[in-house]
A protein has these predicted regions:
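Active-site microenvironment of metallo-dependent hydrolases
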Residues: 1-175
Length: 175
């Protein structure tokens, strides 16, 4: 049934974005401190904004189902990213878009690319796609074989680590 197909493959519908979409609502802002090899976080204090020297970048959740324009942006430490952005639609528990980035323009490019892919995982640097995996089925699954999917995920991880993501952090599942 074509209506079912559309409902399954058209689930990534964020409102139109600009780099201003990722502005912090207040400063200083609390920092979420990652713990290596875990999903547990700590209070990392406060910071005025992105500070690469202190390993502080932006982390945003972008509503993707109803184009509400709801975006929550915080600061993140312990991820290691030195440039670019990493984004995914595989984001337990809500599966909204999660994007971590050094620059608002790369974060915007990453979210826009996920919309074009109808979901997935993407690594962006200086506005260019470094690596990606389309997950058009609900923003969570692909039509690719398990072998091809595993290969793409390995390339995504390598790309994220090449931009500085710490070796003790899974670039996507940690988000």
């Amino acid at each position: 049934d074509s209506s079912l197909s559309g409902r399954i493959t058209n689930t990534v519908n964020p409102a139109p974005l600009s780099k201003e979409s990722f502005a912090l609502k207040r400063t200083p802002e609390y920092v979420i401190q990652l713990t290596p090899w875990q999903i547990i976080t700590k209070n990392g204090g406060k910071a005025a904004g992105v500070d690469i020297d202190r390993d502080i970048i932006k982390l945003s959740v972008v509503e993707r189902f109803k184009s509400t324009g709801h975006i929550g942006t915080a600061l993140l430490s312990g991820y290691g990213l030195k440039r670019g952005a990493v984004a995914t639609t595989v984001a337990h528990d809500s599966h909204n878009i999660i994007v971590a980035g050094v620059s608002d323009s790369d974060m915007t490019a990453a979210v826009n690319r996920l919309k074009e892919l109808r979901g997935g995982m993407v690594v962006i640097d200086n506005g260019k796609i470094i690596s990606e995996l389309a997950l058009p089925l609900g923003g969570l699954m692909t039509f690719l074989s398990a072998y091809e999917t595993a290969d793409r995920i390995n390339k995504l991880r390598d790309a994220a680590h090449s931009l500085g993501v710490s070796d003790n952090i899974d670039p996507f599942m940690t988000l």
